[in-house]
């Protein structure tokens, strides 16, 4: 027949809409026309496909060829369409008999020799194909990442000839081999941090409830050390979470996917990171740091050194767990549910009080003014990490609690949360907070009066309740008590610091 249809998938973030490759061969002047909003890289496929077909032992049709990539309103880029275009050409020119062609989808770039090359984002394309009941053929370069998907619906090929022989029933394509296991537990241990017991307690609460944490203190007190130990307190990703994170990572670094399997992402962008690098962007938007940190941790060291507009762009994703990127050519949603951990010095000189302070209150407030109030309001806990008192360093950290011990308490608290409300504390909405974070009447009145004195917002009220509920779970208490609220209020260092500076200015 002179018409052939082959199925493949486009690349729009982590979504993979179906693309139908239609090839029609008719009499007329020899030539190839490609329609359906193809980008330059797709238009270049005509030369790659021509050479691949000839070097695979077939002939390129010397007729009028029309190739349509439908639907036409979706932008299409990259070399992922080479393989389906080549197969459609061979079927339409009656060089390939493939009666079961519509049971498969194909993605892959072709070398001039006909060899298959991998493409970015194969995981999400394979998952979408499997959902509609079709098997998908990918290149050997993508074997490891699609091997993370359970089942035998993904088939691996190394050359155009192998795919053609498979469709004719002369060759069997195998699914990915080898079982991927979670990476080794080689996280840094919290016991390496000398002193800072309140900081370790805050880290335990953050790990149990999925809360956001701001660490403040002079240089060299252990803020970054504490933050880097958080992944060692968290459970590994579930299979569903791991696939979500792997699908995002495969868009930018496919070779790193299997090494990160079931490990919580830990992203630490430099303060010079641009808005595009942080949230994602491009003419067809690529994922940014907040999406690469999905289901994991985003650590921002030297927080005030980031551009203010970059930090304020995080406000919506922190609340919604996703980022919407709207560009002229494409509008894409990326998941971005992460824990935000930040560290900062309290002043431009590193200290804001005591004998080491070299900054005036005006200079310190100007420095903190780089952080907007709504952004600071997104932190559930803020804690000062002070210089260690005399005698702590000389003891050399003897008797410090290890991460393995703390992890047991964290896992138990998370299990209690999931059994009660089927989600982490940090993900509760306002309606669920009323149900799961109830207070006694006198405690509610006391908390409201306290927040009024501190000038805190309704969002701060809700975050305090969630932190107090996590503390109660860690203590194995059924209800939120006054001492849980008091401990939650003790983790509001940024509010106390701002009030102190404003008092000095008065």
What are these regions (language model features)?
Residues 168-205, 209, 237-290:
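P-loop NTPase nucleotide-binding/switch module
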Residues 295, 301-303, 313:
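Walker B catalytic acidic pair
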Residues 113, 300, 306-307, 350:
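Catalytic P-loop NTPase motifs of RecA-like helicase/translocase cores
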Residues 35-46, 61, 68-78, 284-285, ...:
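Basic, amphipathic alpha-helical bundle interface domains used for macromolecular binding and assembly
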Residues 217, 280, 302:
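The Walker A (P-loop) glycine that initiates the GxxxxGKT/S ATP-binding motif of P-loop NTPases
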Residues 1-214, 218-225, 261, 326, ...:
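Peripheral, non-AAA+ core regions of ATP-driven protein-machinery
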Residues 215-255, 320:
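Walker A/P-loop
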């Amino acid at each position: 027949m002179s018409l052939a249809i082959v199925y493949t998938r486009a690349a729009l973030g982590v979504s993979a809409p179906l693309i139908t490759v239609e090839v029609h061969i008719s009499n007329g002047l020899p030539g190839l026309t490609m329609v359906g909003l193809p980008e330059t890289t797709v238009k270049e496929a005509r030369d790659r496909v021509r050479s691949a077909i000839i070097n695979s032992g077939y002939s390129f049709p010397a007729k009028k060829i029309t190739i349509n990539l439908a639907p036409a309103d979706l932008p299409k880029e990259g070399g992922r369409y080479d393989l389906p275009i080549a197969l459609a050409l061979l079927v339409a020119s009656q060089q390939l008999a493939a009666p079961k062609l519509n049971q498969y989808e194909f993605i892959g770039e072709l070398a001039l020799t006909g060899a298959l090359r991998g493409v970015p984002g194969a995981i999400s394309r394979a998952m979408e194909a499997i959902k509609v009941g079709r098997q998908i053929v990918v290149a050997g370069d993508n074997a490891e990442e699609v091997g993370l998907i359970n089942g035998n619906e993904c088939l691996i090929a190394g050359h155009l000839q192998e795919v053609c022989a498979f469709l004719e029933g002369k060759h069997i394509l195998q699914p990915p081999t080898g079982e991927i296991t979670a990476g080794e537990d080689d996280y840094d241990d919290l016991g390496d941090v000398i002193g800072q017991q309140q900081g370790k307690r805050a880290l335990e609460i953050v790990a149990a409830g999925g809360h956001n944490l701001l660490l403040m203190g002079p240089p060299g007190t252990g803020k970054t050390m504490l933050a880097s130990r958080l992944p060692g307190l968290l459970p590994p990703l579930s299979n569903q979470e791991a696939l979500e994170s792997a699908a995002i990572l495969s868009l930018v670094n496919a070779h790193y996917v299997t090494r990160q399997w079931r490990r919580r992402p830990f992203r630490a962008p430099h303060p010079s990171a641009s808005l595009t690098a942080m949230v994602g962007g491009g003419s067809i938007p690529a994922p940014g740091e907040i999406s690469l940190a999905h289901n994991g941790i985003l650590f921002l060291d030297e927080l005030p050194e980031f551009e203010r507009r970059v930090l304020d762009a995080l406000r919506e994703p922190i609340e919604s767990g996703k980022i919407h990127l709207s560009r002229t050519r494409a509008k894409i949603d990326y998941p971005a549910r992460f824990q935000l951990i930040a560290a900062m010095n309290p002043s431009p000189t590193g200290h804001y009080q005591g004998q080491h302070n070299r900054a005036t209150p005006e200079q310190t407030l100007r420095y903190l003014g780089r952080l907007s109030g709504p952004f600071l309001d997104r932190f559930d806990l803020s804690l000062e990490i002070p210089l260690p008192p005399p005698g702590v360093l000389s003891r050399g950290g003897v008797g410090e609690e290890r991460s393995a011990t703390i992890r047991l308490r964290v896992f138990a608290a998370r299990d209690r949360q999931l059994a009660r409300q089927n989600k982490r504390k940090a993900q509760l909405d306002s309606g669920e907070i009323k149900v799961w974070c109830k207070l006694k009447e006198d405690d509610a009145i006391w908390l409201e009066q306290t927040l009024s004195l501190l000038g805190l917002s309704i969002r701060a009220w809700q975050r305090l309740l969630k932190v107090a509920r996590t503390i109660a779970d860690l203590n194995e208490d059924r209800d939120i008590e006054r001492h849980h609220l008091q401990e939650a209020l003790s983790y509001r260092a940024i509010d106390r610091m701002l009030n102190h500076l404003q008092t000095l200015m008065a």
